[in-house]
């Protein structure tokens, strides 16, 4: 369309009231939750940008599809519809449903990853890293240098450093690298895309070494759209065809359908290796359910199948990426430091730059995230040293490479006025960022501590 205003390419037929907790209620909620935003009740949040995973709105087609869900324990019609869509999209012949992406990771890594292994990735996200490390392996991040600099405007900051991959293979040895993973888009690094050229280069290195190559494909459609916009030779290609080419370069994928499956729950593991698939299915039956439902209801399988078809619609993707850019542009123009360019699913605020007076060991990104909620009821999530610091044997921590706050935008859920409100809150908090103070952890779990840790302010 010739007009500059972004419009949502859908009409809204059903609404849900938003809670509007006051400042006193929000302060009480923070105290009760130990200043961990995961501990807030949903009705204590005004705008919830904690995650885009499973929090979006489904379409009328998806809701209609749920009405014909087949709940048969074995051989459900809904599974075969789901299987057909996944096979058409990915080209992988073995499709294993799971209740969400981390279940696919756990099953795959339990079979394929051993103690002492090294698993290279552009950047592991939290559950991927934890599932690798739970097997006693090293989750090694080898994103390009530009991907670690929030201010660099590189078109594909999610790219894997191919030279570093080759060096890792040389250093570690082929026998200790069970697979190479590329996450599209790169969630931990700002929602940044990976180019087709980079995927081809990674594939060539893996093929030469005989190492399986997997995609963490949660946001494959958003990545495909960035390729269409930014990579030579793809401007006239349909996003679905670009996505198919991405999958064709890999030996398998894990997928959370709660992102680019446009569903509220679900995921899958898809591979070409029949022997690997058989082992994975045996473990699936033990922990998730039978092979034709994998812990999902039939109506969930229907919703995912339809979502995987809708997500590559060009009008949807144009709206999706531009609406994220809209928030990024508003706050950046006001001088708020962000990861540039904007990611596909989220805007990432650079807390280290916004609050340089807070030492990294006092978690500046956690401080910023808390203040966004305290000030305006906006819930984001810390993507920094709370989530990704490496705890060392002497009790100290190796900080994360970046201190970010992610504002993840649920799909087809909020309108432009909601995002305008978020921008106002961010700009106001940023204007007073010199008043932010640090936090210390007073309680934490061994794995994925950011979900349940409790904090106290450092005064």
Predicted regions and their residues:
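A short, surface-exposed helix-loop junction/capping segment
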Residues: 60-67, 351
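Short, conserved charged micro-motifs
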Residues: 278, 356-364, 412-421
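Short, solvent-exposed beta-strand edge segments and adjacent coil->beta transition regions
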Residues: 264-266, 344, 402-406
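Conserved small-domain helix->loop->beta segment predominantly found in fold-type I
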Residues: 292-301, 307-370, 374-401, 437-446
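PLP-dependent enzyme catalytic core of the Aspartate aminotransferase-like
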Residues: 311, 375, 387-459
């Amino acid at each position: 369309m010739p007009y500059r205003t972004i419009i949502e390419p859908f009409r809204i037929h059903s609404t849900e009231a938003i809670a509007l907790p006051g400042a006193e209620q929000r302060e009480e909620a923070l105290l009760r939750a130990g200043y961990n935003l995961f501990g807030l009740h949903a009705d204590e949040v005004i705008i919830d940008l904690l995650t885009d995973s499973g929090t979006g709105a489904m379409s009328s087609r998806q809701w209609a599809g749920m009405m014909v869900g087949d709940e048969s324990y074995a051989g459900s019609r809904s599974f075969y519809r789901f299987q057909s869509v996944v096979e058409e999209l990915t080209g992988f012949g073995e499709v294993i449903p799971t209740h969400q992406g981390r279940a696919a990771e756990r099953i795959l890594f339990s079979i394929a990853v051993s103690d002492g292994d090294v698993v290279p990735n552009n950047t592991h996200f939290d559950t991927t890293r934890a599932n690798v490390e739970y097997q006693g392996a090293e989750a090694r991040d080898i994103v390009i240098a530009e991907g670690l600099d929030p201010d660099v405007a590189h078109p594909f900051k999610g790219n894997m450093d191919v030279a570093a991959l080759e060096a890792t293979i040389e250093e570690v040895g082929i026998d200790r690298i069970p697979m190479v993973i590329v996450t599209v888009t790169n969630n931990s690094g700002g929602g940044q895309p990976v180019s087709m050229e980079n995927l081809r280069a990674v594939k060539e290195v893996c093929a030469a070494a005989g190492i399986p190559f997997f995609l963490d494909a949660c946001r494959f459609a958003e990545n495909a759209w960035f390729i269409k916009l930014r990579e030579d030779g793809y401007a006239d290609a349909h996003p679905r065809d670009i996505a198919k080419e991405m999958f064709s370069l890999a030996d398998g994928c894990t997928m959370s359908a709660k992102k680019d499956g446009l569903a509220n729950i679900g995921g899958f593991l898809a591979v070409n290796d029949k022997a690997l698939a058989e082992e994975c299915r045996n473990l699936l039956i033990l922990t998730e359910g039978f092979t034709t439902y994998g812990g999902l209801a039939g109506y969930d399988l229907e919703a995912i199948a339809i979502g995987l078809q809708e997500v590559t619609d060009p009008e949807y993707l144009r709206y999706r990426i531009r609406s994220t850019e809209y928030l990024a542009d508003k706050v950046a123009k006001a001088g708020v430091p962000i990861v540039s360019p904007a990611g596909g699913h989220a805007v990432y605020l650079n807390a280290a730059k916004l609050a340089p007076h807070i030492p990294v060991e006092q978690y500046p990104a956690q401080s910023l995230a808390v203040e966004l909620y305290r000030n305006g009821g906006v819930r984001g999530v810390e993507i920094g040293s709370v989530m990704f610091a490496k705890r060392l044997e002497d009790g100290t921590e190796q900080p994360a490479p970046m201190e970010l706050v992610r504002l993840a935008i649920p799909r087809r859920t909020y309108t432009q006025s909601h995002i305008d409100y978020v921008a106002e809150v961010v700009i106001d908090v940023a204007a007073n960022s010199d008043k932010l103070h640090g936090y210390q952890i007073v309680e934490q779990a061994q794995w994925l501590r950011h979900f349940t840790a409790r904090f106290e302010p450092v005064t």
